[in-house]
C-alpha cells in the first residue's frame, strides 16, 4: 500500500432540481445498475407525493426523516481472547447520514405500495413522524449498543 498522501473526500455535485447535496447523495443511494435518471424520477415523484399529502416543504420532511433514522451508536465485532464481543462505538457524522439513507431505502423497498416512489414517500412520512421500519431499525441498533455497554472498554 503506497504511503504517499491521504486521498480527500470527493465533493458531490448538488442535484439539478433543488440544488441540494443531501438530495444528490440520496439519489445515489437509490440508484441501481447506474440508472441515475430513473433514481432521480423516483425521488422527485416521492417528494411530489409528500408535498401533496403534507403540504409542508418536502425537503424539510426528508431532513426530519433522516434526523429520526440517524444512529448515534452502533456495535462492532471485536475478537478478544477467543471470544467475540459486540462493542458499542460512536458513529461518525458521514456514516450516520449514509446509514440513515441506506435504512430508509431498504425499508421503502420492503413496503407494499405499488411504485417505489409511493413506497419511499410513505417511509419518509413515517420516519418524519418517528414511526416506520427504518426508525425501528435505528432503535434496534441503539438497544443492541445499550445491551453491550459492559464491553465499551474494548473500544479501539
Swiss-Prot record:
Keywords: Ribonucleoprotein, Ribosomal protein, RNA-binding, rRNA-binding, tRNA-binding
Matches recorded under Gene3D superfamilies: Ribosomal protein S7 domain
CDD domains linked: uS7_Bacteria (cd14869)
An annotated GO cellular component: small ribosomal subunit
Pfam families: Ribosomal_S7
GO BP term (any one): translation
PROSITE patterns for the chain: RIBOSOMAL_S7
Top-rank taxon: Bacteria
Gene Ontology molecular-function annotations: rRNA binding; structural constituent of ribosome; tRNA binding
InterPro entries: Ribosomal_uS7, Ribosomal_uS7_bac/org-type, Ribosomal_uS7_CS, Ribosomal_uS7_dom, Ribosomal_uS7_dom_sf
Presence of the UniProt keyword Glycoprotein in the record: no
Protein task: One of the primary rRNA binding proteins, it binds directly to 16S rRNA where it nucleates assembly of the head domain of the 30S subunit. Is located at the subunit interface close to the decoding center, probably blocks exit of the E-site tRNA.
Subunit structure and binding partners: Part of the 30S ribosomal subunit. Contacts proteins S9 and S11.
Protein family (similarity comment): Belongs to the universal ribosomal protein uS7 family.
PANTHER family: RIBOSOMAL PROTEIN S7 (PTHR11205)
NCBIfam families: rpsG_bact
Identification of the protein by name: Small ribosomal subunit protein uS7
